[in-house]
A protein has these predicted regions:
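Catalytic alpha/beta core domains of metabolic enzymes, predominantly
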Residues: 16-149
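Short beta-strand/loop segments at the ligand-binding rim of alpha/beta enzyme cores
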Residues: 7-11, 65-68
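Generic serine detector
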Residues: 9, 16-19, 27, 50, ...
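Short, small-residue-biased leader/transition segments that mark boundaries at the very start
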Residues: 1-6
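C-terminal functional modules
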Residues: 145-255
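N-terminal start-of-chain detector that recognizes signal peptides
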Residues: 9-11, 41, 86-88, 185-189
Length: 255
């Protein structure tokens, strides 16, 4: 190869093998601008990476400041990859059979830089769903409760949300809506006991908290003052584990 071609090339390291191999490479002080990493994909069911191992590998990559990539699998009919086994083609075993956009949301939430579809051919619907993902912010798909008032609907779907820094293990609190909508009426209208994944907008009965949006991280007894206004779809509930202090998040309506 011409020298200029080699100079512009990058070396891709296998990100799935653990940190020993990586430590060996990095001990030779390579030009990190020319080093990237990518995880494997796994065509046979039950052979994909565990989340724990995946996270440990990624931690090592990030400590070295290396770019990371991982694979998602299309669930379209008759997809195929480089091997004759056709049981999906993902990096994480837990992603097998998940909607492709949920797989990608999860990878981005873990800090992965690039997401690659491993098998052919993703459907138009899958490609569209992937194109609508916000890499910079957790976005949850939700279903609104029947009869939700317009202000509560607007708070859920249109306002900018971020969790408070003084984090609660029971809920993520987005408090700016109670400031913006101070003086508006928030009568109680739907106050069942609260389940993990429920979206709450506090009612007037909570006085100074009226209008505050909360995301339930655990099941809770409802005092009768908290309006449950929406719920995160079941397949995305595990993404709640990625809400940390100051995490930005948003919601979109299930189609």
């Amino acid at each position: 190869f011409p020298y200029t071609t080699l100079f512009r090339s990058k070396i891709e390291l296998n990100a799935s093998g653990g940190s020993g191999y990586l430590d060996n490479v990095m001990s030779n002080f390579p030009n990190k601008d020319k080093v990237i990493t990518c995880h494997n994909f796994y065509p046979q069911r039950y052979t994909g990476l565990s989340l724990e191992h995946f996270n440990n590998c990624n931690k090592a990559m990030k400590e070295y400041g290396l770019h990371t990539a991982a694979f998602v699998s299309s669930n379209n009919n008759d997809t195929f990859g480089p091997w004759p086994v056709r049981e999906g083609l993902c990096t994480l075993e837990m992603h097998r059979d998940m909607p492709i956009d949920v797989q990608a949301k999860h990878l981005f939430a873990t800090g992965i830089d690039d997401v690659i579809i491993a098998n052919c051919y993703a459907s138009e619907e899958e490609l569209k769903a992937l194109s609508e993902i916000n890499k910079e912010m957790l976005e949850f798909t939700v279903e609104l409760v029947d009869g939700i008032p317009e202000i509560e609907r607007k708070i859920v779907l249109e306002e900018f949300h971020f969790n408070r820094g003084d984090n609660s293990e029971y809920m993520a609190r987005s408090t700016q809506s109670r400031v913006k909508y101070k003086g508006e009426k928030f009568p109680p209208f739907n106050t069942p006991d609260i389940k993990r994944g429920d979206i709450i907008v506090e009612s007037d009965l909570y006085t100074r908290y009226a209008g505050e949006l909360q995301v339930a991280l655990k099941d809770m007894k409802n005092s009768g003052k908290s309006n449950v206004v929406a719920r995160i779809v079941e397949e995305e509930l595990f993404l709640l584990d990625y809400i940390e202090p100051w995490t930005k998040f948003s919601f979109k309506l299930k189609k």
